[in-house]
Amino acid sequence: MALICELDEQWSFVGSKARQHWLWYAYNTKTGGVLAYTFGPRTDETCRELLALLTPFNIGMLTSDDWGSYGREVPKDKHLTGKIFTQRIERNNLTLRTRIKRLARKTICFSRSVEIHEKVIGTFIEKHMFY
């Protein structure tokens, strides 16, 4: 059975808001869990990294917002764009932002190192959101 998967990226920072750090992840719409995630800048290369992590899964359709990297990197025959197709992952972004204060936009809780930032967020996702 082929999966329908939502893709999105979420902004955060390390040290100061000028040092942007992005969480890219794929959300399984059937189980409500995270299939794969990666960290990196908001570039096509990071998008390719995420798509490479999804190759073991039988994914029939990928949905995302209209961010340019998805349009360039996701195969056209498997890609749908639009707000209606990303409601679940956007809601999950809010859950992550609420439960992990390092992802909040206006906060005094932030990481000082990229290594700790990625470990804290990665551990949370692996413990609470992999299905």
From Swiss-Prot:
Functional description taken from the UniProt entry: Absolutely required for transposition of IS1.
Membrane-spanning parts: none
Family membership noted in the UniProt record: Belongs to the transposase 27 family.
Protein name per its UniProtKB record: Insertion element iso-IS1n protein InsB
Keyword Nucleotide-binding: no
Position of the signal peptide: none
GO MF entries: DNA binding; transposase activity
Pfam families xref list: DDE_Tnp_IS1
